[in-house]
């Protein structure tokens, strides 16, 4: 039976963190800005527990794909909230929302 080399695992994690920071400069800048106006730099408290040094910032999402502001594409295996039901930006839902918004969206 083999054992896990914890030192090697820690070294790999450190290397991945460096790569993440290098590859996400725009997300890092936005996170630093967000920290000035939001607790933990995120819109919801459960988002504070991010696995890396800062979260990615999404530019857009379609179906099960999210694109961050750096242009990296991710497959969204979580599809939280309404994304789980229909994917991100389903055309029929986007069209229905746009039709309604043209009628007014801030009425009391």
Predicted regions and their residues:
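Short, compositionally biased low-complexity segments
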Residues: 1-11
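Short glycine-rich loop/turn motifs that provide flexible caps or phosphate-binding loops at active sites
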Residues: 40, 62, 70, 79, ...
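Short active-site-proximal "capping" loops at secondary-structure junctions
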Residues: 51-52, 63, 82-83
């Amino acid at each position: 039976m083999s054992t896990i080399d914890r030192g090697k695992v820690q070294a790999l994690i450190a290397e991945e963190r460096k790569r993440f920071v290098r590859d996400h400069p725009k997300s890092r800048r936005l996170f630093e800005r967000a920290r000035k106006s939001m607790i933990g730099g995120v819109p919801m408290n459960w988002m504070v527990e991010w696995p890396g040094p800062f979260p990615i910032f999404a530019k857009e999402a379609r179906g099960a794909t999210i694109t961050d502001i750096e242009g990296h594409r991710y497959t969204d295996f979580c599809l939280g909230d309404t994304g789980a039901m229909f994917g991100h930006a389903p055309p029929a839902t986007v069209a229905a929302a746009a039709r309604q918004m043209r009628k007014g969206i801030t009425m009391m």
